[in-house]
Amino acid sequence: LSKLLQLLVSSSANFRNVVRQTWEARPCSRDEPWHLVVYGDEVVPGNVLRLDNKRKFFAVYVTVKEFGPAFLKHEQLWFPIAIIRSCVAKNRIPGNLYGCMRLLFRKWFLTDRIDHDGVLLDLGIPDSRYVNVYFKLGNVVADGDAYRAIWSAKGASGTLPCLLCKNIVSQETLPLLSTLFLPIR
């Protein structure tokens, strides 16, 4: 991601201007980073009803929330970060798609440390020229099936439909849970 952003800023004057306008409107710091928006969805070229469609793949795109709605509506500002063939993820990668996403997030936040060290970009700003842009994970946009695959969660069919929510339990188990150890609100 770091090298892609540096390449785009150095080779595209339009992208450099978008990043520069965003920086001038809302400069970021390690304490107030910009938010990455990650979008993922499965793409099925050809016959979607075919059972053994080996051409099916999962596409991962990323953008920056701070670009704002005026820019985010343009597909040119959603950058393809990964194209993962579904049959490869399923058969060769531990954890399937979740394992792939884990590798991406680890690369960005643990290896490249885009949240702590930032990404050095040449925006051509007078007197400073280079800026250090920091990022944190802001949103993950996906449909139900992609959500399930990205987070290795059961999604709507499970007892934990949202990663930030508490488990869903039946009314019959509430008295038992409250007497054991869980405070029920």
Model-predicted segments: where are they?
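Residues in well-ordered beta-strands of folded domains
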Residues: Y39, Y61-K65, P80-I84, K136-V140, ...
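A short catalytic or substrate-binding loop motif that flags glycine-/basic-rich loops and adjacent residues
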Residues: S29-R30, D52-K54
